[in-house]
């Protein structure tokens, strides 16, 4: 048997397995099709002022990205997009001026709002209406190098901790 032929045959047989392992194995159902009722908040209690409490964690999240407002069950306006350092400062300033303990959520806290059964974005659209499909900042830092921070991709709720901290992205706020 020719070794070159065996080598290339092994490569060709390995490629489909490798490519299949890179896919998202969840159901490709859009969350807007998966959730059919505004009445069932699916683990969240809606509060006044465009915020919602996650029942199992007790965390309170803004329902819209910073810069948007909840009007008639939809997020209106444009999300503020800042680099990581400016996003942290922006939320600290809101906390100081409002007297509320708002902060940018950690990557673990952000994962609390994402759903495993659906995508595009992977959130309940009745809890987080018309959320932009984008990377959202978290407050989580990468060990090294210092140039990177963690974000969560809203399309499928995946964490990415090699995001340049200089990239401007939307973000939510959370409080305990």
Where are each of the predicted segments found?
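Glycine-aromatic-enriched surface loops/turns that form tight recognition elements
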Residues: 4, 19-103, 107-176
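Bacterial N-terminal signal peptides that target proteins for export
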Residues: 1-11
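Bacterial N-terminal signal peptides
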Residues: 10-18
